[in-house]
From Swiss-Prot:
Source organism: Oryza sativa subsp. japonica
Any single biological process term in GO: cell projection assembly
Annotated region described as Disordered, given as residue ranges: 1267-1359
GO cellular component: endoplasmic reticulum membrane; nucleus; SCAR complex
Composition-biased stretches (Basic and acidic residues): 1272-1282, 1300-1310
Function: Involved in regulation of actin and microtubule organization. Part of a WAVE complex that activates the Arp2/3 complex.
Lineage of source species: Eukaryota, Viridiplantae, Streptophyta, Embryophyta, Tracheophyta
Protein name listed in UniProt: Probable protein NAP1
Pfam families named in the record: Nckap1
PANTHER family: MEMBRANE-ASSOCIATED PROTEIN HEM (PTHR12093:SF10), NCK-ASSOCIATED PROTEIN 1 (PTHR12093)
Assembly description: Binds PIR.
Length: 1359
């Protein structure tokens, strides 16, 4: 095994840092110039003097970042231990770095720096020591990289300290306004040196060193590792680190004090918010002198404000490690200003130490010692008094500033955030309106970005910070709902966007400045003072090279500025070379000589011009780097959890602004820059965390967007506006207001809106404003790029709105206990769509298309079987969840009556009724009247109706299969029944009736089938009404097309499809039979001769027990157990089966003959013959049923006869295949008239005993006369079982809104036709009809009805 060896030779001192100086990272722009200096920079002047070498300074600063990153990684692996308190978690021992033997390891750490051999570890834990000895090789390998880290810390300390001492002793001046470039490089290294050593106290250095050494002893026969004693000395010196820093930096302390004093004015300015505002340091125009730009009023101050964050860090770190400098008179104020507004001292990323505790622990004792020395009089009396007073003031300041910071730190920063919010907001507005002034004020923009960056980072650094040693145990209160953070992030984002937008203009302005600068520098070089300096050849050559670079800068002209590519690295390199020479104490010409020689001209000195040229050159080719330095928020990655919390608290809060969300998201773009290339696993981790942060914020943003939409789409939102004033109330108020003499007691218009409602209106306005603002911002936001992930907020917003619409749509469908009424769903849907259309006006995307896709997806379960001929695989069936819910609910509750709520069909109102609410919600009529079904059709369109029709078909097909099975199983009994009817043998007929099995169950099935057919009829009528209303041309086309279809049996496939489409919209009068016919064709039933016995099977229902449990309801015009739906089932199934039988016979004939005789083809293929057969079968059913009813007539069965007679009368009325007078052939109409008279008369007496009934008008006598007298009506056939004066046609005309008017018109016509009473029925009347007709019209042919001459008012015995 190759162990670590220590080499300290100067030759390879920099080669060991190659792993920390990764070329993949983009170094700061300044370091590029420094690194270039290492190759081409001068090694000395003509006299052979040695000048400054700045490349090692910059390299060591980068090395410090690498060392900090490695220590940060070790700290996280070890679960953030506390080595000073010897507190280690369970995860520390399971991390795989240290051996899992806590007793031995903690003992070694506590006894440091004693040698492990002297600790008698076998007495501490003999078993652990033996295990350590056995696996020493593996444990030592685990510690290799971390012991190397300690060696790197040792080497870094030696090299950095040597450089710091060399710079402090050789640099003439370190003032910000003269030598800022070298000053920043020097202070960066100084601060990095301090941070590295302070951070090293957070890792278990003693334990790592001691455990590694004992493992080395075990493996190498008792020898210590070669670097052990030097590392012990190093760790012991820096235990604690501040103590070692005090000793190491004692010699550079005066220079640090000078620097901190020099940056004091800028720090004072940055904390004086009043002066910043009044003097316009962050405003393009001076507040008191609007005719001048502030850039020319105080350019250096505006530029230095960009560095104030660094200056504050210099003060905090400098006075901590150089406490003697606090005893300067001016240092007290500088230190107090910075200490008063901070509680922590940031070390690296989110690692920190408590600021005031460390000052009181390490700085205060030094001050007290100086105070004692001054008091003892070791110095001169006057100086002793001054030093004593200063030390006393510093002592007082350090004792009090902690409490002041706890009280005022957050308030100070909050005030500063408000200032920056205002100034940056104005700056964005100004530069947006006047972009030409952005370039001259670019340094001011950088200053504003830097100050805002500092405030945002400070806010998150201090979240949850608690002071452990405060006398009151207080914590700084950070408001998580502070909206200023969002404003700052938003302002910074907008400023950066402005800079990037006008980067060509800034570049052009900088090039123009540099071009003019060349002339000024040439002039200054030719002044008498410079000539007198007698510069050496090196400096002269460098100045000439600077002039050459400036004079060869391309001239920006017109539109070619963006195309200019200009690399000014050489210019900056040459100027830095000049600075390194003239700032060295070894140079014969220094910076003071240059300033004195050129400042007498009344213009800027040579050094100032050169520094300005240096800064403006960076605006040409390094502008993006500068923008990233001052405006980047990558450090917020380490606080991204706090960032998410504050975002959620401020985004939609009372003072929040939803439009700030883009800035919160944009911060994540720079998060991956935090990853250190020397720790590969960091790249993936930070990338995952960044993506997770963006996804979390997007989830919150979309949740807020949904919340805004749902607030508006609620009863307290737009819903409240719908209920403010009913139309009736509005009409009363308006009518009252227009009258000359208003009715007293009614308020005039304008008083309806109570003052209490104004707040709700304001809430709606605020919600609408936030919604539109958020949509607009998300729509305009650029894509968020995090590593290889791209987040496009428009797409997320569209998905959010569409997804929320889908969820809201599903919630609209159901109430707590029931389905919502379709009309209510439609109203809620329209309200939600109005909100989406409001948002759509601010989005450059088509949301309406997405809404249609959702509605289509919720309605679509497959293509239209009759319109769309393409086939879809069965496995691709999906969607339609909403229509599935509604369809299944309708089938279960109105066709199957699964909830047992007593659902019956009300023929008078053309809807279903129930005796109790369905599911505790509404009655059945609230869901099935024409208005609700039309709303259902409008909601789900043709696909939804098709789904409902498909479920009806499935249910009906199952019932038809049961009928088919019953016909097959009862074929013998039915054939016997047919024979006995033809022979007139009643005994055999009764015997055959008794042999029919499951007649009760079959009757229930047929009633259910009738309910399905009835519901389907209501549905197609609603479809037809909606089509006629919305697309009247298409409806008219279908209606005309249905009348022109060829009368052939069987139809061609295209004709079948057209006929079914027409039937699906309620066109025609026989669509019930057509629908049953299509079902029978699909399931393959009615393929044998057993279906010819269907009339006999249906007639057998007259012997069922269901008649004994039913009652006729005069209000609904139907039976309590829906027996009237059985009539529709019989008519439809007989008709559909006959069409199927004829098609089957046609196919058999085609197969047997090979072809058909052309002369016979028209007769065989005519639908007229099919309808004649249907009519014959229906007449047979009526005849057989009437015979069974009359034959069973006796006193005990009389109550059961009445429902049967009414049922047969209803059948003749509703069937399109039977004339209205069919029943009169078998049963005298006088009987029916008497029955209706008794039922309706009793009902009228019970409901309206005090008023004359309108039903006793002459119209009633006509309504209950023989049907033969009512054939003169052109298009309707009356229903004898109702007393309503209007009637449905046999073709199933609809009961709609115009029905009442038609009823009154018909009533007036009928009154004029007949004035006789209800019993005026003479024997002179004739019944006329044509047997071959399938409609209610009648031709020649008549028969006398002599039995009606002896009719009585009550039912007669029929023999």
């Amino acid at each position: 095994m190759a162990h670590v060896s220590f080499k300290s030779k100067e030759a390879d001192s920099m080669s060991r840092w190659s792993k920390y100086l990764s070329t993949e990272e983009s170094p700061p722009s300044a370091s590029l110039s420094w690194r270039a200096m290492g190759v081409d920079g001068p090694q000395g002047s003509a006299s052979g003097q040695k000048h400054l070498q700045m490349e090692p300074v910059v390299q060591l600063s980068k090395v410090a970042e690498g060392l900090l990153a490695k220590m940060y990684r070790l700290n996280s692996i070890l679960d953030y231990p506390d080595p000073n308190a010897h507190t280690f978690s369970e995860a520390f021992w399971k991390a795989g770095v240290m051996p899992n033997f806590p007793k031995i390891c903690i003992t070694l750490s506590k006894k440091f720096p004693e040698h492990p051999n002297k600790l008698q570890l076998e007495k501490v834990d003999k078993f652990a020591l033996d295990a350590l000895n056995e696996n020493a090789e593996g444990y030592m390998q685990n510690l290799e990289q971390w012991i190397t880290l300690l060696l790197d810390l040792l080497e870094f300390r030696e090299q950095a300290l040597r450089l710091i001492l060399d710079l402090s002793s050789t640099v003439i001046t370190l003032l910000p306004h003269q030598n800022s470039l070298i000053l920043h490089a020097f202070m960066d290294l100084f601060c990095s040196f301090v941070r590295v050593n302070l951070f090293s106290d957070k890792i278990p250095r003693k334990m790592i060193l001691q455990v590694y050494n004992i493992l080395h002893i075990m493996l190498k026969g008792g020898r210590d590792c070669e670097f052990y004693h030097r590392l012990v000395q190093f760790v012991d010196l820096y235990d604690p680190p501040v103590k070692g820093l005090h000793e190491d930096l004692n010699f550079v302390s005066p220079r640090i004090g000078e620097v901190l004093e020099a940056v004091g004015p800028i720090i004072f300015l940055s904390t004086d918010t009043k002066k910043l505002r009044n003097e316009g340091f962050l405003s393009p125009f001076h507040p008191r002198y609007p005719d001048i730009l502030t850039n020319s009023a105080h350019p250096m101050r505006a530029q230095d404000l960009a560095n104030v964050t660094s200056y504050r860090e210099w003060v905090l770190l400098g006075y901590l490690v150089c406490p003697d400098e606090l005893l300067r008179v001016t240092s007290i104020d500088v230190a107090m200003v910075v200490l008063k507004e901070n509680l922590v001292l940031s070390l690296f990323r989110d690692e920190y130490i408590l600021l005031h505790e460390n000052y009181q622990l390490y700085v205060l004792p030094k001050v007290l010692e100086s105070k004692r020395m001054a008091k003892s009089g070791r110095t001169k009396q006057k100086e002793a008094d001054l030093e004593y007073n200063v030390a006393k003031q510093v002592e007082k300041m350090l004792m009090e500033v902690h409490e002041q910071a706890l009280v005022s730190a957050d308030a100070l920063h909050h005030e500063r955030r408000i200032l920056l919010k205002q100034e940056i907001g104005r700056m964005v507005l100004f530069f947006t309106d006047q972009p030409s002034l952005l370039a001259p004020n670019i340094q001011m923009v950088f200053s504003a970005l830097a100050l805002a960056q500092c405030e945002v980072v400070w806010y998150f650094q201090h979240v949850g910070i608690a002071s452990s040693k405060s006398s009151r145990g207080r914590t700084v209160d950070i408001d998580a709902a502070d909206p200023t953070i969002g404003f700052l992030l938003d302002g910074m984002g907008k400023l950066c966007c402005l800079v990037r937008k006008y980067i060509a203009a800034i570049k052009g302005y900088a090039l123009s400045y540099l071009s003019s600068c060349a002339g000024r520098i040439r002039f200054l070089l030719g002044t008498p003072g410079m000539v007198a300096l007698d510069l050496d050849a090196t400096l002269k050559g460098l100045f000439q090279q600077v002039l050459h670079c400036l004079e060869n800068i391309p001239k920006p002209q017109g539109e070619n500025v963006p195309a200019i590519t200009c690399d000014l690295t050489d210019l900056r390199k040459h100027w830095l070379s000049i600075l390194m020479i003239v700032t060295s104490s070894r140079s014969s010409v220094n910076i003071r000589h240059l300033e004195k020689a050129t400042v007498s001209t009344g213009k800027e000195g040579l050094v100032s011009e050169g520094n300005a040229a240096y800064n403006w050159s960076r605006c040409v080719d390094e502008l993006e780097g500068q923008l990233s330095k001052h405006g980047s928020l990558k450090k917020l990655y380490f606080y991204h959890q706090h960032l998410t919390t504050v975002f959620r608290n401020t985004m939609f809060g009372p003072e929040g602004r939803p439009q700030h969300c883009c800035a919160w998201l944009g911060a994540a773009c720079c998060f991956p820059e935090c990853a250190s290339s020397i720790i590969p696993e960091e790249v993936n981790k930070i990338g995952r965390d960044s993506i997770s942060y963006v996804e979390s914020l997007i989830e919150s943003i979309m949740g807020g967007l949904e919340g805004l939409i749902n607030i508006l789409d609620s009863e307290g939102g737009f819903g409240s506006l719908e209920m403010q004033l009913s139309p009736e109330q509005a009409a009363i108020r308006l009518n009252n207001a227009t009258r000359a003499k208003a009715v007293s007691g009614l308020l005039a218009p304008g008083h309806e809106s109570y003052p209490d409602n104004s707040s709700s209106v304001k809430m709606l306005e605020a919600a609408m404003q936030r919604l539109t603002s958020l949509c607009s911002v998300l729509n305009d936001m650029e894509p968020i790029c995090v590593l290889n992930h791209v987040f496009i907020l428009r797409e997320y917003m569209r998905d959010c709105i569409i997804g929320n619409f889908r969820r809201r749509f599903h919630s609209m469908i159901r109430t707590d206990s029931c389905l919502q009424r379709p009309s209510v769903i439609e109203s809620l849907l329209r309200r939600h769509l109005s909100i989406i259309h409001l948002a759509e006006q601010h989005i450059s995307m088509d949301l309406t298309e997405g809404i249609r896709e959702v509605l289509l997806a919720e309605s679509f379960t497959g293509p239209f079987p009759n319109l769309q001929v393409f086939e879809t695989p069965t496995e691709t069936h999906g969607g339609g969840s909403a229509i599935d819910i509604i369809s299944n609910w309708y089938i279960d509750n109105f066709v199957k009556d699964a909830s047992r709520t007593g659902v019956v069909f009300d023929a008078s109102q053309n809807c279903f009724r129930s005796s109790q609410p369905i599911g505790g919600g509404y009655l059945a009529e609230a869901f099935t009247d024409k208005r609700e079904l039309k709303a259902l059709v409008r909601l789900f369109g043709g696909y939804g109706v098709d789904r409902l029709d498909k479920l009806l078909r499935e249910h009906t097909s199952a019932l038809l299969n049961c009928i088919d099975s019953a016909l097959r199983s009862n074929r013998d009994a039915l054939e016997g029944l047919a024979g006995s009817v033809n022979s007139g043998d009643r005994i055999e007929r009764d015997a055959n009736l008794k042999q029919i099995i499951d007649i009760e169950t079959l009757a229930d099935f047929c009633i259910q089938a009738g309910q399905a057919i009835t519901f389907r009829r209501l549905l197609v009528e609603a479809v037809g009404a909606v089509l006629e209303e919305k697309v009247p041309l298409i409806y008219s086309l279908l209606k005309g097309l249905a009348m022109q279809l060829p009368e052939e049996v069987p139809d061609k496939n295209e004709i079948i499809r057209l006929r079914r489409v027409a039937s699906s919209v309620g066109v025609g009068d026989k669509h019930d039979a057509e629908w049953v016919h299509s079902i029978l064709a699909e399931i393959g039933s009615a393929n044998d001769n057993s279906w010819t016995l269907l009339p006999y099977l249906c007639a057998a229902f007259m012997a069922s027990n269901m008649w004994s449990t039913t009652a006729y309801d005069v209000n609904t015009g139907g039976f309590s157990n829906n027996l009237h739906c059985l009539a529709r089932c019989v008519s439809a199934v007989v008709g559909g089966s006959e069409y199927t039988r004829m098609e089957r016979e046609h196919r058999r004939s085609s197969l047997s003959n090979g072809h058909m005789d052309e002369l016979q083809e028209p007769e065989l293929l005519s639908r007229v013959s099919a309808e004649a057969n249907i009519k014959s079968a229906m007449q047979l059913y009526v005849k057989l049923s009437a015979g069974l009813v009359l034959d069973s007539w006796n006193d005990t069965s009389r109550p059961y006869i009445v429902p049967k007679l009414i049922f047969l009368d209803q059948l003749c009325e509703m069937s399109p295949y039977l004339p209205r007078s069919t029943l009169e052939v078998h049963i005298p109409y006088t009987i029916l008239r008497s029955i209706y008279h008794q039922l309706y008369g009793a009902s009228l007496m019970a409901t309206e005993p005090m008023e004359p009934s309108p039903r006793q008008s002459p119209l009633i006598s006509l309504a209950h006369a023989s049907p033969s007298m009512k054939q003169n009506r052109a298009d309707t056939t009356p229903r004898s079982h109702t007393f309503e004066p209007g009637y449905h046609s046999s073709s199933g005309s609809q009961y709609d809104e115009g029905y009442e008017g038609d009823r009154r018109t018909g009533e007036r016509q009928l009154r004029s036709m007949r004035r006789s009473g209800p019993l005026d029925y003479t024997g002179t009347r004739k019944v006329k009809f044509v047997e071959g007709s399938s409609s209610g019209s009648h031709g020649a042919g008549s028969g006398s009805l002599q039995r009606f001459a002896v009719s009585r008012s009550g039912p007669l015995s029929y023999k």
